[in-house]
Amino acid sequence: MASLSRVLRVAATCPRGRSARNLGLQPLAREARPTTEKSVPYQCTLKEEAQGASVVPQGPSQPLPSTANVVVIGGGSLGCQTLYHLAKLGVGGVVLLERERLTSGTTWHTAGLLWQLRPSDVEVELLAHTRQVVSHDLEEETGLHTGWIQNGGLFIASNQQRLDEYKRLMSLGKAYGIESHVLSPAETKDLYPLMNVDDLYGTLYVPRDGTMDPAGTCTTLTRAAVARGAQVIENCAVTGIRVRTDDFGVRRVTAVETQHGSIQTPCVVNCAGVWASSVGRMAGVKVPLVAMHHAYVVTERIEGIQNMPNVRDHDASVYLRLQGDALSVGGYEANPIFWDEVSDKFAFGLFDLDWDVFTQHIEGAINRVPVLEKTGIKSTVCGPESFTPDHKPLMGEAPELRGFFLGCGFNSAGMMLGGGCGQELAHWIVHGRPEKDMYSYDIRRFHHSLTDHPRWIRERSHESYAKNYSVVFPHDEPLAGRNMRRDPLHEELLGQGCVFQERQGWERPGWFNPQETAQVLDYDYYGAYGHQAHKDYAYSRLLGDEYTFDFPPHHCVIQKECLACRTAAAVFNMSYFGKFYLLGADARKAPDWLFSADVNRPPGSTVYTCMLNQRGGTESDLTVSCLAPGAQASPLAPAFEGDGYYLAVGGAVAQHNWSHINTVLQDQEFRCQLMDCSEDLGMLSIQGPASRDILQDVLDADLSNEAFPFSTHQLVRAAGHLVRAIRLSFVGELGWELHVPQASCLPVYRAVMAAGAKHGLVNAGYRAIDSLSIEKGYRHWHADLRSDDSPLEAGLAFTCKLKTSVPFLGREALEKQRATGLRRRLVCLTVEEEVPMFGLEAIWRNGQVVGHVRRADFGFTVNKTIAYGYIRDPSGGPVSLDFVKNGDYALERMGVTYAAQVHLKSPFDPDNKRVKGIY
């Protein structure tokens, strides 16, 4: 039996591909062929269950029903959790089909770790539900122990930034009642005597973290589900998905096919893990994930390790999971092995471990727990895991096919997120939407041009894997999968120092660096797989300046952009925005139902509105411009009769908006057409006190308040080019948006810049928009306004036509909420001290935590940190305006509290004078 120290010595001295052979272990299998006999955790349990020792399919474990309300494909963590939660919701006729045995493929060999704290409030809630299910609910329902062990979790910080990140998690945890403690190196040593703490800055200890047993959990889940009437059928591989097209041209699921018969069903849930892409192809659904090898080793017995907490040493990219009197050691490396040809025969097999890839984890583990240097290796575990382009799962109804839901791509976190995600997916299926804001997991977050783009999926999934243990900084950007979607101004702005951000494939301006050009280069895989790592990469270097929880070096550059907008004018390239036309016979009925505001206005009007879901949550905020009918003139003026509307939505969420609108149109059977002109039109926003003077020299229209009021639009000519000018502002200033055909973008931009030179016009990016908009109190969807926030809670009641009798989606929920009182309310808080905040900070009121910050930034005009978050009354009652006003507030940042002032209105221009041109 090889010791870990010998592994390191042999790996360091042997040619590549020989190290494992010299250790007497299994030879390397670079071709990724699986082996079937390995001594691994859970294998014996799985092979010795009552159903028999063989894992060779012997036909279905029970007869197939002819019909089902829901068919879940895949018996891993997500499939079993979804089945269980559907059954708990009272859904009858639910069937789970597993091609082999429960947990085969990936779940059976997973480490089963559960950490309660992550840098996302939604994920903290999902993890809490998983913990509740495995530690309490299942045992209470079935009398069976799931294998849950509460031994605690310990996060290791070997630098100050990592410790700062942990302190942020601790502050967020206080909003959810999660106990955690930042420990000194000495306190860490007392807790974990075998640990080397000489290089530590500190640790974060979470006593109620623990581990789950995959086999025990899935077995108990399915027993509980079966007791409620669900069916579990093993040894029954799915071979096809039957689809029909209805009278409106909408594709819908009708049946699942297997070698043993078919099941008629309107709903399929793809929980097939690594095989989810194959199942998707059966139905014509794109599933953007890749399969990779993911490994850990199990040590021999270690004296004194019993009852120690699980460890995540993020800076060494390694975890140490307690396994009885031994440890499992694993992690995430920069050069994982892709499994390109996923075998449909693979079930309980494993890959041979590539020690050349895995060695770095051994080094990190020995440094952290030195006794491992002389500890033997009991077994190696290297199996397939699925990873996605943004390291978030794929969930929800596929936009290509109604009734086809995804629950896959969990990036090695399927066990810990399974309970929460299974519950949300069940609600999604039954009620049409989840209860929580699941946008970060919703398959509709990806633009359709990306979900079947192999290079983008592979590059982004690799980077997500390689950076899994990296510090999560607020303004990080990917290096992989860039330059997928660029507007006509890209090269022009690059030459002027634009530092770009990426949003759903689009390159959009982040900020402007006057010192150098920062081109985004092709992805170098961090030097792995024979790629040459980029040297002196300006964009990467500037991005590195963002790796801080303090103000970055270019904070002053963003300040100049903001102040120029407030005192003169700034031009923002917002071409990445989604731009849609809503036309057709029901183009008046559909907007009445879709939009919370009354958009039944005369042509030339523009309305800011929300779109809601049935529970009154906000699915989007957008602008809707009412059009005049006529003959088609350009992408700016489509031909239509009756009513027509032009919609502008944030580019990062455009696909989500597109899918939501189409789903509502289909469900209500509205005879409407939604046309996407996002790629045909650019969008320039010129904002600031001097914007009217600048544009008056460019546009052939009278821009006075009387001729061109706020919230109106006109077709005009800009430097001879037809554009749609809309008088709106995302930053709280006098200004206009110019919606410009792609071919005209560059000449129009140059004309604007030339006219603005004498007025102090500057380029500005989205970092400035973030600051300016929070200063004005404008909402950002998916930050301080989400699908689980109502407009009433968010202070947007003015966007809702509740004073009319017009029905709209979500109206009943809003009326009920208004009658019973708001149980939470969005508040604005400012801090006098110049301290950076980014969100997740705890909100204190009168000595109690009442919420956490959703969004924060520095306001350069008011010279204060500004934060927005939802607060609750700890007594459980409604949150009245008096409750908001009559409290002493503080914000906790990284364990330090700062006195804060609460505001009922935006602290900047509360009377809305500037957007009206009143200075």
UniProtKB/Swiss-Prot annotation:
Check the record and name the Pfam families matching this protein: DAO, FAO_M, GCV_T, GCV_T_C
* Catalytic activity, reaction form: (6S)-5,6,7,8-tetrahydrofolyl-(gamma-L-Glu)(n) + sarcosine + oxidized [electron-transfer flavoprotein] + H(+) = (6R)-5,10-methylenetetrahydrofolyl-(gamma-L-Glu)(n) + reduced [electron-transfer flavoprotein] + glycine
Q: Where in the sequence is Phosphotyrosine found?
A: Y778
Q: Which GO terms describe its molecular function?
A: flavin adenine dinucleotide binding; folic acid binding; oxidoreductase activity; sarcosine dehydrogenase activity
Cofactor binding notes: Binds 1 FAD covalently per monomer.
**Which UniProt keywords are listed?**
Acetylation, FAD, Flavoprotein, Mitochondrion, Oxidoreductase, Phosphoprotein, Transit peptide
Tissue expression remark: High levels in liver, lung, kidney, thymus and oviduct, and intermediate levels in the prostate, seminal vesicle, cardiac muscle and neuro-intermediate pituitary lobe. Also expressed in pancreas and adrenal gland.
Could you identify this protein by its name? Sarcosine dehydrogenase, mitochondrial
Origin species: Rattus norvegicus (Rat)
